[in-house]
């Protein structure tokens, strides 16, 4: 199925690219989320008419993500207190939601879907550098310090 991308999508293409994708990917992900439209003559004409508007919107989103990345990088270590045993092993874990809530409480909006924990949740006390992906092109690192509750 041929589609026109309305957003930059990792490993697929940029705004305005006509790409061929599997029908299920288009029908279940790209089209419902508004990231693409079916590539037919009428949609191509509509897209070309709206191209400048869509590019301006993408540029504004990128600028906002860069601003948030600067704020996140400027943050001191975000402290999360959790119950832990004698050897620093947590009773439970610190996950995406906990990190996002702590960063939001520190003054920078962060959604749990933007937090990247490739090795899974944090299960020990200590200092960690957690990557956050604010935009397809913008990544930042937030310092998280997990301490034992008194």
From Swiss-Prot:
Gene Ontology MF terms: rRNA binding; structural constituent of ribosome
Disulphides: none
Any one GO biological process: translation
Keyword Ribosomal protein in annotation: yes
GO cellular component, one term: ribonucleoprotein complex
Pfam family, one: Ribosomal_L9_C
Keyword terms: Ribonucleoprotein, Ribosomal protein, RNA-binding, rRNA-binding
InterPro entries linked: Ribosomal_bL9, Ribosomal_bL9/RNase_H1_N, Ribosomal_bL9_bac/chp, Ribosomal_bL9_C, Ribosomal_bL9_C_sf, Ribosomal_bL9_N, Ribosomal_bL9_N_sf
PROSITE patterns listed in its UniProt record: RIBOSOMAL_L9
Family of the protein in this entry: Belongs to the bacterial ribosomal protein bL9 family.
HAMAP family according to UniProt: Ribosomal_bL9
Job description of the protein: Binds to the 23S rRNA.
Protein's name according to its UniProt entry: Large ribosomal subunit protein bL9
Originating species: Shewanella baltica (strain OS185)
